[in-house]
Amino acid sequence: MDNWLALFDGQTRYFLDINDSSVKPDVLRFRGSEALSEPFRWDIEFTSPQADIPPEQVLMKYATFRMRGGKNVHGMVTRLEWLSTSQDQSHYRLTLSSRLALLGYTRQCAVFQNQSVPEVVEQVLRKHGLEGADFEFRLERTYPPREIITQWRETDLQFIRRILSEVGIYWRTEMDDTRELDTYIFADSQLNYQFDVRLPYSEPSGLFDGAAESVWDVRTWHNIATGTVATRDYNYRTAATPMDATVSVRSDAVTTGEHYRYAAPYRDAGDDASPEPETESGAFYARLHHERELNRSARIHLFSNAAHLTPGQVLEPQGDVITALEEGVVLTLVTYRGARDSRLHVSVWGMPYTERYCFRPAEIPRPEIHGTLPARTESREKNDIYAHLDEQGRYRVRLDFDRSDSEPGYGYLWLRMAKPYAGDTLGWHTPLIDGTEVAIAYSNGDIDLPYIAYALHDSEHPDLVNRDNHTRHILRTPANNKLRMEDKRGEEHIKLATEYGKTQLNTGHLVDAQGQRRGQGAELRTDEWGTIRAGKGLFVSADAQAKAQGEALDRDAALKEIDRLNQQLQQLEMAAEQALALKADVDSQIEMFEQRLKPLNEVVLFSAPEGMALTSGEHLQMTATKNVAINAGGDISAGVMGNMTALAGEKLGLFARTGQLSVKSGEGAVEVQAQNASLRLFAEKKLTLSSASDISFAGKKRITLIGGGSYLRLEAGKVEYGTTATYIRKVKRTMFAGANSTPTPSISIPLVDDLIRNGFFDEQFRILDDSGKPMANVPYFISSENGETFKGVTDNQGLCKRVFSKESAKLTVWLGVLALERW
């Protein structure tokens, strides 16, 4: 239409109005470029009688470029160039740009979390002052929120173009003539093309095209396209789930081969058999990339003089057209060229329209980070003494470049930490607490695939090893759990310690907190309780094993000593047997030696070549369910300052093979009783009883003295003596008196109850009052769950008689009247 009007009126066909400016441009010539998913740019040359136009009069001003045929371009002046000045006028060139072009002047490093691509784009647009009427999302798909979207050293324009290209969303520009602003439509399907754009296809005749709007001079390019796109990715969150997808979009293009894309960023494989796979799945990205390949399989170029042609339209050339134009042409790039003295030239690029696939912007690669970025681990509580982890052991961090005011503990996504060793609930993980400096690395440089590479010390968190202790290797936790290894020659040591109870294992050259020597060898200590437990057996030895050479369980020295003493004990046993003394149970000791000590079978064996001592500030107790054996190749000495007691449930034997058996009391009496049997004294030689005072013999029934065939019997008030030889009595005087007798001294022999019965379970109760004192003479009745009963009264110590049972059973006790009722 502009060309048609120019034939008659000779007036200016192009106008440039700059808002809020005194500059009145007269358009000389122009060149414009508009494309899908790109900001438009119009370079306009103009003349003005005003010389030296101040830049502030033009730059960052809204402006409108109008054609008399009806096309209006609203934008922002972003560039002004002075070309020349004559006597009458000055010659300038300015650039009229899309408002989106202004996003190219803001470069950011930013992190967006848990937002979808459209949400992030909208946030960026609104940050630059664009409102709801300035843009519109016409999307057929629902886009899921991403865990993270990173903007890295990109302008805001580069950033939104990149993330939109990743998901195949394109955008086109429309002009709002009412508000005189450019607006933007974001779309993801063919449904949002502009249809019903028709122009006749007419090749120009000669140098004149008749000024009628048309298209002409079609050119086409056809290329072989990839036949199949296959994708694969790895998602550590579902490590065992296959992440493969293969897609081939039906088309008329000639295709061959396969494009395999590994590490395409997606979380789920998706259904690659579906024509509409789940958004942002592996199948979605495979289809998207194949659509891009098909976009390049056929290209169309046309010339036109129609000013209203714009990217995003589906142009339907009318008339006798080639096959490539029959379904229409999706306009992807339109350039305009015109001047004050020449007609409008429009150059159109596009691709054949098809319902099988849509225009997709070329994929813009993500920026890559092939190093690390500084960050700090972050907890929800400042200075948290414990690591802030999720159920997978991942961390939150705050990147040093992040300027957002996000809530503590939510500044970045959950991150895995690289470790020197990992496996199924096994590995090496030393948790990092709030404020620890870490280096964030990126898998294959992908800015949206971060992980913690390692931790570092800094000025606020100094290294625990430095020039002052450079010979040490230290692992220390915040609670001062510590593994320290000293490599200083001649002072090597290892310390494993925890603050709880000051529990430590120290080996080698032992030092104190100041590094001063306090011992050598090995030390295991704690302020709390200690346990050494070995289920198969424990060998504790002071036998030397130089330079750690030899078997760990080398017990030859200890076993030889035990075997030698057992042989000596066997000889003593034989002598005791010949002397009719009580035999020692040597067989059980030999059995233990063979079955327990030699194989170290569930026993504890102590060995020391030069001596062993056990000491206690209070009590020292040795107990055994069966036997206690003490053997010595020399002497056994037992000394006590109080009482010494030897109690035997059955027999007690003392046998001295070659020396004397001596029993002496320095102050108290010596008392020997056979409470329920005989008492025998025998000597192969002379038997002597002597006293510095009196000797009394008392027998309740009789006393009989026998010697050399003669006897003396005292019985039932009679004195009887007899001999087979001479009876000699040598006395100075003999006195006779009346009958008399001396009573036999009464000796009380207590009844000793059984305390232990082999093969029986036993229990004994003590009855105490509220003050804790024993209660004597209290009737009691005890019943077991297997029917056995026991009754009696408590003694002076409040004790009931010990009860025995062959089976373990629950006991019930009644006291006092309740007990008497059951008697």
Where do the protein language model's features map onto the residues?
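Amphipathic alpha-helical and helix-coil boundary elements used as assembly
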Residues: 1-823
